[in-house]
């Protein structure tokens, strides 16, 4: 069992490297997932990262924590660390874009956005990891993706780190706005009970 878990964790890193347009210790910018070999598609991986992938066209089937899903155009898949991910069929015309964040970095960005709604969004996404976006929301995701990719691969500058952090924080708010058609996010009330709740949730990320 330990060997099986170790192989799952090893393959998750190897697979992400094969579809990476950019990678460092904190973030991986993903490109074509259909570059993954057929053997790897059917091998489960234990994700050791926060993952966000948008389907641009085509279809794919997959299993998340032993639950089957289909992803199509404008579907956004968000997975949290330790999700058991298994690819099924990936269409020849399947195209996607997205990124991975290390758990430590994702936690820092998550907390920096300072919204109590983050926790409600997280709980919802754990039960509903795939959400459908409209064309405008998908275009917005691609804009964030392209800007992140551009900034990460450009010549480093003094405020690059702060800029990347700000872009990812803005992305979190955009996703929360997109989720309002699915769930009613509660207004943020900054009081002692919410502060305790947020502190407790930080320990769980």
Descriptions of predicted regions:
Residues 1-70:
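Generic protein-terminus/edge-of-domain signal
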Residues 7, 18-21, 88-153:
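A hydrophobic/aromatic-rich effector-binding and dimerization subdomain
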Residues 38-39, 73-74, 82, 104:
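Tight coil/turn sites that cap or link beta-strands
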Residues 51-54, 140-147, 167, 171-174:
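Amphipathic, well-ordered alpha-helical segments in soluble domains
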Residues 56, 142-156, 201-205:
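Regular secondary-structure segments
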Residues 66-80:
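Short acidic-glycine-tyrosine-enriched beta hairpin
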Residues 77, 81-87, 106-107:
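Histidine-centered metal-chelating micro-motifs
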Residues 132-135, 155-164, 175-205:
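Short, Lys/Arg-enriched, Trp-marked, Pro/Gly-tolerant hinge/linker segments that flank
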């Amino acid at each position: 069992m330990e060997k099986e878990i170790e192989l799952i964790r090893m393959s998750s890193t190897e697979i992400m490297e094969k579809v990476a347009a950019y990678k460092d210790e904190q973030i991986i910018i993903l490109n074509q997932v259909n570059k993954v070999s057929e053997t790897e598609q059917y091998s489960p991986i234990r994700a050791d990262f926060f993952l966000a992938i948008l389907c641009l066209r085509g279809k794919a089937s997959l299993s998340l924590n032993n639950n089957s899903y289909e992803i199509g155009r404008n579907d956004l898949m968000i997975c949290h660390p330790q999700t058991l991910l298994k690819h099924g069929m990936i269409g020849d015309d399947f195209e996607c874009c997205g990124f991975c964040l290390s758990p430590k970095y994702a936690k820092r960005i998550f907390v920096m956005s300072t919204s109590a709604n983050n926790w409600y969004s997280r709980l919802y996404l754990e039960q509903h990891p795939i959400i459908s976006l409209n064309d405008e929301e998908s275009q917005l995701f691609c804009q964030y993706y392209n800007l992140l990719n551009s900034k990460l691969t450009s010549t480093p500058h003094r405020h690059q780190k702060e800029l990347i952090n700000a872009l990812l924080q803005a992305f979190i708010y955009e996703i929360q706005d997109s989720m309002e058609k699915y769930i009613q996010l509660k207004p943020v009330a900054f009081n002692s009970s919410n502060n305790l709740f947020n502190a407790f949730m930080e320990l769980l990320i």
